[in-house]
């Protein structure tokens, strides 16, 4: 038989009413009671307290309570006699003798029932007398001996190379009944049980309280996105931006293992990622991981897909979703489209643009009468290979515009070698792939060639007049990249003749007043507030 004893004195001075004060909407003592009741190996749970309010709240959660003698509630009294008294009282009441006794501290609300259950299982399978909960904190430390400071180590090493240094967390202590005495709960054969660092916080000060409450409010969020040549890398980059702005939440990317470009980019970004092979496998994983939110950045969804997902997760957010499934999502964020005929769960247009961090501190482009630098950027994979067409044009017209430099920013999924795109300084052509800080390149550009994806918002933020060609029919539905916002849109790129592209280029280079007006139209937009709105919608902080 296993007994869990939860000691909870009423006279907390550092944080008044600490044990019953609401922590993330529940009395602090709830978490210890919840863990004990959800541990299958624990037979009985008792709360020992000198405080009537604590006993009443504990009783409402369906556990045994006992009024602690006033002599055992004094400041100088240690836990040993308190726990011993509780065990003896329960044994007398139940007419039994317990085999194992667990002390559970109220001040460790981050301890999970899973960790407690595993610790107890390990203890029951061992020959140890006592388990003490610890966290491994290897650090270089010093002590004082004979009036001198001396190191607690033999050799200075990096923290990862130091030997284990186990600190007691106070979360729980498991011991065999025969090892218990009035003034001791620790037997001769002692072992430690290492618990996750996140769960090891012990509330002793107000700052500990704030940290625990923050951790308990943390949400588990899945970002579901793929990246490959035909689709492009925009969904991966967009979800990375979301992840960087969801600091403090528990984030996990989920992507299909067969789409290597997207997977590679996530790994390069050092993001936690789980791979799947199919939507069916994804649903199975969602049931296992139990997220609070799923953000689905995979274009159009089917109704059955979202309905199935909603069975396992409270909040489903879809991005750029024009499919039937969007009607069943909690939130649909379509920054690239506008269609206000659909439901109240849709959020449309540039108010919901998510700019990458680098664009919040980027310097706007300085306008020049004479074009000096042109940036060419067609996304992560450029499936229509517009890059090649502009590259050939740049070389062809160099004799007419020798002062102009073309800067090609190639995506990680673009095959530079196969397309023979390389730097040629004599022709004024400069090529870079997978740039880490694209805003620097935009900042010195006088003109840009781009497709009709999210890059148009980044160009608008910097104020770079741009010629736009859509990669596909879907991109043509994106509403922002039009002349009223500073873009010269040529439509579906595969239908645009090379002659038209060149004529457009020459006209813009030779008419600075048009470029200046385009820049002015771009700069009137405030695109930096969108990410805050989107994060609010994901976390359900804004509707």
Each PLM stretch: what is its role?
Residues 443-454, 464:
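Acidic donor-binding loop of glycosyltransferase active sites
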Residues 81, 85-86, 108-196:
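Conserved core of the sugar-phosphate nucleotidyltransferase
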Residues 52-102, 110-118, 277-289, 300-301, ...:
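Short phosphate-binding loop-to-helix
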Residues 259, 372-445:
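Donor-nucleotide binding loops and adjacent catalytic segments primarily
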Residues 205, 527-543:
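C-terminal alpha-helical cap of glycosyltransferases
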Residues 507, 513-528:
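A short, well-ordered alpha-helix in the C-terminal region of glycosyltransferases
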Residues 83, 228-230, 238, 244-245, ...:
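Active-site and donor-binding regions of nucleotide-sugar-utilizing enzymes
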Residues 186-204, 208-211, 328-385, 416:
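A nucleotide-sugar donor-handling region in carbohydrate enzymes
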């Amino acid at each position: 038989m296993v007994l869990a004893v939860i000691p909870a004195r009423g006279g907390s001075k550092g944080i008044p009413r600490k044990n019953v004060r609401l922590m993330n909407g529940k009395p602090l003592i709830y978490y210890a009671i919840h863990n004990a009741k959800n541990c299958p190996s624990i037979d009985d749970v008792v709360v020992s307290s000198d405080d009537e309010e604590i006993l009443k709240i504990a009783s409402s959660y369906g556990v045994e309570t006992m009024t602690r003698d006033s002599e055992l509630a004094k400041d100088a009294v240690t836990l040993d006699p308190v726990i011993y008294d509780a065990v003896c009282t329960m044994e007398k009441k139940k007419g039994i003798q317990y085999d194992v006794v667990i002390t559970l501290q109220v001040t460790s609300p981050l301890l999970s029932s899973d960790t407690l259950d595993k610790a107890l299982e390990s203890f029951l399978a061992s020959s140890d007398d006592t388990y003490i909960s610890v966290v491994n904190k290897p650090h270089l430390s010093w002590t004082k001996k004979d009036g001198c400071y001396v190191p607690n180590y033999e050799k200075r090493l990096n923290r990862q190379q130091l030997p284990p240094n186990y600190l007691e967390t106070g979360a729980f202590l498991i011991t065999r009944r025969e090892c218990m005495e009035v003034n001791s709960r620790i037997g001769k054969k002692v072992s430690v049980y290492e618990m996750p660092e996140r769960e090891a916080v012990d509330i002793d000060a107000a700052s500990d309280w704030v940290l625990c409450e923050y951790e308990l409010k943390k949400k588990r969020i899945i970002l579901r996105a793929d990246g490959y040549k035909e689709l492009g890398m925009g969904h991966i980059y967009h979800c990375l931006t979301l992840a960087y702005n969801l600091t403090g939440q528990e984030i996990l990317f989920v992507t299909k293992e067969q789409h290597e470009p997207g997977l590679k980019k996530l790994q390069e970004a050092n993001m936690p990622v789980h791979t799947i092979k199919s939507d069916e496998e994804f649903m199975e994983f969602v049931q296992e991981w139990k997220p609070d939110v799923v953000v689905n950045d995979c274009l159009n969804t089917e109704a059955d897909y979202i309905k199935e997902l909603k069975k396992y997760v409270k909040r489903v957010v879809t991005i750029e979703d024009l499919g039937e499934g969007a009607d069943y999502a909690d939130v649909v964020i379509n920054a690239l489209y506008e269609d206000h005929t659909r439901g109240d769960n849709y959020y449309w247009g540039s108010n919901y643009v998510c700019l990458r961090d680098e664009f919040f501190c980027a310097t706007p482009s300085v306008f020049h009468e004479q074009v000096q630098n042109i940036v060419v950027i067609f996304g992560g994979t450029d499936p229509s290979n517009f890059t090649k067409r502009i590259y050939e044009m740049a070389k062809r017209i160099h004799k007419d515009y020798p002062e102009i430099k073309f800067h090609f920013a190639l995506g990680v999924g673009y095959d530079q070698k196969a397309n023979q795109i390389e730097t040629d300084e004599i022709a004024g052509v400069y090529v870079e792939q997978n740039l880490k800080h694209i805003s620097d390149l935009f900042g010195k550009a006088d003109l840009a060639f781009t497709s009709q994806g999210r890059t148009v918002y980044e160009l608008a933020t910097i104020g770079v007049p741009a010629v736009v060609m859509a990669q596909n029919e879907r991109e043509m539905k994106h509403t922002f990249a039009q002349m009223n916002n500073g873009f010269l849109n040529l439509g579906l790129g595969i239908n645009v003749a090379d002659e038209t592209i060149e004529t457009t280029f020459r006209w813009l280079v030779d008419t600075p007043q048009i470029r200046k007006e385009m820049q002015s139209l771009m700069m009137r937009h405030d695109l930096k507030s969108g990410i805050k709105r989107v994060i609010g919608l994901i976390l359900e902080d804004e509707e």
